[in-house]
């Protein structure tokens, strides 16, 4: 991706044969939406299936270790604006800590391939109006809080802290 033009054609066709590039877009959208402060250099994961005859042969990004979201934890990645007012569409403003290139790959795909650019914009708008909407997120987060809350007394007894501090 770094050394080839990603305009529609042979180079991009090869990338599509190896990488589910939409998962990279979704990965960036979700992490930027929740203002994850620990993802570009540390908690990045990708996988593919090992069965050559299976349907999971392309590399794809996956979410994990999401405790540094919504302004919690330490800003290890150096996100320029970790507040709720951060611009989720400012891929160019994200750093490339550790030189791992995830940001550069997405930026190059968006800038050189109209299909990727269109997908990124439309998908982000769709998510903003559905799964990222306040109504949906508040309901989801409240349900998660209700699921986790009964465990917090035992958790703080074992690991320290307080339930009040967790809330």
Residue locations for each model-derived region?
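Middle-to-C-terminal accessory/interaction subdomains
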Residues: 1-50, 54-167
